[in-house]
Amino acid sequence: MLDTMRWTGDGLLELLDQTRLPFEKSYIKCTEYTDVAEAIKRLAVRGAPAIGAAAAYGLVLAARKIRANTKKEFLTELEARARELAATRPTAVNLHWALNRMLRKMRLAEPEDAGLLCDLLLEEAQAIFREDITGNRRMARYGLELIPEGARILTHCNAGALATAGYGTALGLVRAAHEAGRRVSVYAGETRPLLQGARLTAWEMLQEGIPVTLITDSMAGYLLAKGKADLVVVGADRIAANGDVANKIGTYSLAVLAREHKIPFYVAAPVSTIDLSLASGEEIPIEERDSSEVTHLAGRPVAPEGVNVWNPAFDVTPARLITAIITDRGIVKPPYDENLRKTVEGLNRNLVIELTAEDGKSNL
């Protein structure tokens, strides 16, 4: 599997350009934090854990260009850059979690020298990257108990190695089951409008030798009606305190279909995706993207010019439709309002700075 991102050691961050997959494998060379911000905005790097790790490295690039006489001045400039990075994607909470973790490291740091502070920032970014991979593998081990022998798994969008620092969340469970010899197979919904399921999930599964069948999003109901899938597993971009889950648009529809056809609907996400500051999914800011993503396909128009378009990137699945949430600290089952809070107890979640979305809603 290709690296989602790699730090070269000489102030260069390389990001796999996922807009070009599966037909071209190329990396974007980022030497400025603005390069990282642009890559996140245009979905060259995507997936909540991946953009969190990328933004952490982006803040390192920003710090290296700051010229300040005091630590206070350094922090002021760094916080401004963090706000810019946070504004790139308002829904995925991992982005804001990672940036606040980086800023907290600076607030608690003893050195006053900018060079030493930059070294500490790099160490923290690398820790975020490493911890995501180990956390994903741990999550997969927990989730294995929910994946039976021969399971036919329906998934949506891409929550694999490409969406993380490595291994994956929802697809990490699939990968672990495959490695355990459970003969699993995958149905990948294409995931309009940007086709992450067709372009990325199908490609990942083929690379791993895991049987995969591609379907259009509108086929999911009939697939379940015909009894061709045993369970649904998806990732998450933000989980509210009551267990409501924001994920790629179309996830809610799958949850409703899974309930109708009485099959389990699982969410796999690290605890950094849980946002206890939001009581329910109604408070989650939902990103809306450009109409051209819907009216054009591969750069060619597929709709009449001038048609009105609504293009939310995410939807919210109510907690009542979710069978269990698989995290890197264990499996969480209802009642979610109690058990999610217990799951994140002991984690340092205190804000250093409030990173606010463009619509004015707090993202943490």
Curated annotation (Swiss-Prot):
The active site is at 237 (proton donor). Its EC number is 5.3.1.23. It is an enzyme of class 5 (isomerase). SUPFAM superfamilies: NagB/RpiA/CoA transferase-like. It catalyses: 5-(methylsulfanyl)-alpha-D-ribose 1-phosphate = 5-(methylsulfanyl)-D-ribulose 1-phosphate. GO terms for biological process: L-methionine salvage from methylthioadenosine. Keywords: Amino-acid biosynthesis, Isomerase, Methionine biosynthesis. PANTHER family: METHYLTHIORIBOSE-1-PHOSPHATE ISOMERASE. This is Methylthioribose-1-phosphate isomerase. The gene is mtnA.
